């Protein structure tokens, strides 16, 4: 048995490998072609690939990045200020991108009266050297000042897109199970996907 959780072991490293709708994949592919990303607010239910996409963008662009969990260290404004300031204000030596990236995961858990306004200031202060990618389940919990400074991308999957994305995940999960030498019943796996859809982590 591997020591790694499958969600990490098999996390896609490229946008082309992420299970996304065609519109989303095209949007993120354009950023890669331009070799530039704006500040982003990725919104959608849990397990739809927001953090995976954020990491894949950074990896493919060759950008130095850090991940801050908004439900953990992101709740403490002093820690947040120190972490982001130290990272964003330094010049990247190894990265291939023009900008560093701060990924703020679960940003909707951050205090809307103190922490989120501070992030707005960081976006403006470090714009020349750094970009921010925020992920959230509920974009209505993100203050308007952050909305207006980001390109907002909705990961919501419509009923018309459900079959295609669920089928793609069924295929991916089958490949994972085979690589782990685990026997499985395709119908059972399909039922599990249907039960937890669109949360691909469960």
Q: What is the predicted function of each stretch?
A:
Residues 1-161, 167-168, 187-191:
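P-loop/Walker A NTP-binding region and its immediately flanking N-terminal helices
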Residues 178, 193-197:
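Alpha-solenoid HEAT/Armadillo repeat architecture
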Residues 184-186, 196-202:
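The conserved phosphate-sensing helix
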Residues 166-189:
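Helix-loop-helix "sensor" segment of P-loop NTPases
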């Amino acid at each position: 048995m591997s020591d790694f959780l499958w969600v990490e072991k098999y996390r896609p490293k490229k946008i082309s490998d992420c299970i996304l709708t065609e519109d989303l994949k095209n949007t993120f592919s354009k950023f890669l072609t331009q070799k530039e990303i704006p500040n982003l607010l990725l919104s959608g239910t849990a397990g739809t690939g927001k953090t995976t996409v954020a990491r894949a963008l950074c990896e493919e662009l060759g950008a130095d990045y850090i991940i801050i969990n908004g439900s953990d260290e992101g709740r403490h404004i002093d820690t947040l200020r120190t972490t982001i300031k130290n990272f964003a204000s330094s010049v990247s030596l190894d990265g291939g991108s023009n900008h560093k990236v701060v990924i703020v995961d679960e940003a909707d858990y951050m205090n809307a009266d103190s922490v989120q306004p501070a992030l707005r200031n960081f976006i403006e202060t470090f714009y020349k050297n750094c970009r921010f990618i925020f992920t959230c389940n509920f974009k209505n919990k993100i203050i308007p000042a952050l909305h207006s400074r980001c390109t907002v991308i909705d990961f919501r999957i419509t009923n018309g897109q459900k079959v295609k994305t669920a089928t793609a995940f069924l295929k991916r999960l089958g490949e994972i199970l085979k690589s782990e030498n685990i026997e499985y019943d395709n119908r059972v796996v399909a039922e599990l996907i249907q039960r937890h859809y669109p949360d691909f982590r469960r």
